């Protein structure tokens, strides 16, 4: 992977998600220079993944998955940690005609046992055939998958060692299943919702054209988890479908160092970023007077807010403090998303 971040400005003619499938969207984005960039909690970029490289690696991985004897429509469970490998597996499934299922990369209250129980329930309900987890989550996933008959549970490195099949990719169209998105589970156990290519592409077009009105010069930034609607649809798929570069900070790193969000918004000159109310509240409470001198948030034109109750006092507090750094309170944009309505 490159060590220089992907550019904001580029020469590829802009298209606002006017594609039939996600793989078609990536095929087009890969003709340009934009892509995804990943940062540590200390604000250092550790990986960059141009869409051209994402396409190449996803297609290689897709042939490895097909080499396992998987068939079109089989479900692939993916622990959705914020890293390049998740993007590669998600789009490998698109090319291979498989259905990715993003699973949470968070150990909630209750620790090991509760997380394993949660994963086990999700693996069962999703009817996954294989499952991938980064090294730090592998033991949890292996324990959760015991007795479920999965063909393989492994790390990205383990899947990379598989032989590739010399086969043509299956035909895909707008009626194919793109992925399975689990509901938030706010009131009961999360429910898997089947998202078809036609639905997700329509949703992406609406967001790009009418929601945030993305255009040349825009750049996205996100610390949202890849297994939630706002993170996956809004800040993974929207950038691909609009040929827009995006910068990522892991959710856990944000929770430990919330000011890094503002540092990286300043550094990357991102124009679009979303968060629930608590994200804005956490930043406003943690920021120090001396920090304000180092921020320049004048580029931030869309500050999306949603996923939980929107509290006006939280937004007012954030806008008042960050106004010193060039933040425009008119950037706030309420958003609403549900897996059931994608």
What label would you give each PLM region?
Residues 37-88, 108-115, 171, 195-198:
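Conserved AMP-binding/adenylate-forming core of the ANL superfamily
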Residues 80, 101-121, 135-137, 244-265:
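ATP-dependent adenylate-forming carboxylate-activation enzymes
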Residues 83-108, 121-130, 218-219, 237-247, ...:
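A short helix-loop-beta submotif of the ANL/AMP-binding
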Residues 201-219, 229-271, 286-290:
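Conserved AMP-binding/adenylation subdomain of ANL enzymes
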Residues 265, 270-274, 286-342:
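Gly/Ser/Thr-rich phosphate-binding loop
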């Amino acid at each position: 992977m490159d060590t220089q971040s992907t550019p904001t400005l580029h020469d590829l003619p802009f298209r606002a998600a006017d594609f039939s499938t996600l793989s078609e969207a990536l095929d087009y984005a890969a003709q340009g220079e934009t892509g995804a960039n990943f940062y540590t909690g200390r604000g250092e970029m550790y990986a960059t993944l141009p869409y051209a490289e994402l396409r190449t690696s996803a297609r290689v991985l897709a042939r490895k998955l097909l080499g396992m004897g998987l068939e079109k429509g089989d479900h692939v469970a993916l622990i959705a940690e914020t890293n390049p490998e998740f993007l590669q597996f998600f789009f490998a499934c698109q090319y291979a005609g498989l259905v990715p299922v993003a699973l949470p990369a968070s150990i909630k209250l209750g620790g090991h046992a509760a997380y394993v129980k949660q994963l086990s329930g999700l693996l069962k309900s999703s009817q996954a055939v294989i499952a991938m987890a980064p090294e730090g989550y592998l033991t949890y996933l292996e324990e959760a998958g015991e007795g479920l008959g999965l063909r393989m549970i492994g790390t990205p490195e383990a899947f990379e060692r598989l032989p590739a099949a010399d086969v043509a990719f299956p035909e895909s169209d707008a009626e194919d299943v793109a992925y399975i998105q689990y509901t938030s589970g706010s009131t009961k156990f999360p429910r898997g919702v089947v998202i078809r290519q036609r639905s997700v592409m329509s949703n992406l077009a609406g967001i790009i054209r009418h929601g945030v009105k993305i255009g040349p010069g825009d750049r996205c930034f996100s610390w949202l988890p890849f297994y939630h609607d706002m993170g996956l649809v809004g800040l993974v798929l929207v950038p691909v479908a609009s040929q827009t570069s995006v910068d990522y900070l892991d959710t856990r790193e944000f929770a430990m160092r919330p000011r890094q969000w503002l540092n990286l918004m300043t550094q990357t000159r991102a124009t679009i970023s979303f968060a629930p109310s608590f994200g804005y509240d956490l930043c406003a409470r943690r920021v120090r007077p001396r920090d304000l001198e180092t921020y320049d948030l004048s580029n931030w034109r869309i500050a999306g807010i949603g996923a939980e109750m929107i509290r006006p006092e939280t937004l007012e507090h954030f806008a008042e403090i960050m106004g010193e750094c060039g933040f425009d309170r008119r950037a706030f944009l309420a958003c609403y998303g549900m897996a059931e309505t994608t």
